[in-house]
Curated annotation (Swiss-Prot):
GO-annotated biological processes: ribosomal small subunit assembly; translation
Annotated keywords: Cytoplasm, Ribosome biogenesis
Organism: Nitratidesulfovibrio vulgaris (strain ATCC 29579 / DSM 644 / CCUG 34227 / NCIMB 8303 / VKM B-1760 / Hildenborough) (Desulfovibrio vulgaris)
Compartment list: Cytoplasm
Organismal lineage: Bacteria, Pseudomonadati, Thermodesulfobacteriota, Desulfovibrionia, Desulfovibrionales
Superkingdom, taxonomy of origin: Bacteria
Protein name per UniProt: Ribosome maturation factor RimP
Gene name, Swiss-Prot/TrEMBL: rimP
Family in the record: Belongs to the RimP family.
HAMAP family on file: RimP
Disulfide topology: none
Chain coiled-coil ranges: none
Keyword Repressor appears in the UniProt entry: no
CDD domains, per database record: YlxS_C (cd01734)
Protein function: Required for maturation of 30S ribosomal subunits.
Length: 172
């Protein structure tokens, strides 16, 4: 089964149960190595509790076993996406425009030769295109200071949590 097919199967199995708890599936990570690890990231309007993660783990784990979705031994991990949440779809980034993110591309772009990893301010999400002002870029108003990339060209994207200066209120 391909990663996309496995992701879709797990999402279909977990979705209704998560909805009944007022949660949503933020994303799925699969890692293969010495052992297979299936990571489910779940979130809700008020976040997610440890008890909810445990309940989701029991329910989804049982469903995966009954349906024999993964034929080899695996470990199921369920957690919140956290402060430095990974992004699994471009539209997940929209609420974080203006915040700092880290972006790793599959291949370098012609505008930024030899460079695949970027940190900087998320300027916009336009459909499937992510617009970022990388750290160390030329003058902010210059067009070459902006990285525009299709989500299909992104290997990994994470929010960077910036802790507030002592005595200042955190950004929301």
């Amino acid at each position: 089964m391909t990663k996309q097919a496995l992701d879709a199967t797990i999402a279909d199995m977990a979705g209704p149960f998560l909805a009944s708890l007022g949660l949503e599936l933020w994303g799925i990570e699969l890692s293969y190595g010495g052992r297979t690890v299936v990571r489910l990231f779940v979130d809700g309007p008020e976040g997610v509790t440890i008890d909810q993660c445990a309940e989701v783990s029991r329910h989804v784990g049982l469903a995966l076993e009954v349906e024999d979705v993964i034929s080899s031994a695996y470990v199921l991990e369920v957690s919140s996406p956290g402060l430095e949440r990974p992004f699994f779809r471009a539209e997940q980034m929209s609420p974080y425009v203006g915040r700092q993110i880290e972006l790793t591309l599959i291949d370098p772009t012609p505008e930024w030769p030899g460079r695949r990893k970027f940190r900087g301010e998320l300027l916009a999400v336009e459909g499937d295109t992510v617009v970022l002002r990388p750290e160390g870029a030329p003058a902010p108003e210059a067009e070459e200071a902006v990285l525009r990339t299709s989500w299909q060209g992104v290997r990994k994207a994470n929010l960077i949590h910036v802790f507030p200066e002592p005595g200042h209120k955190p950004r929301r």
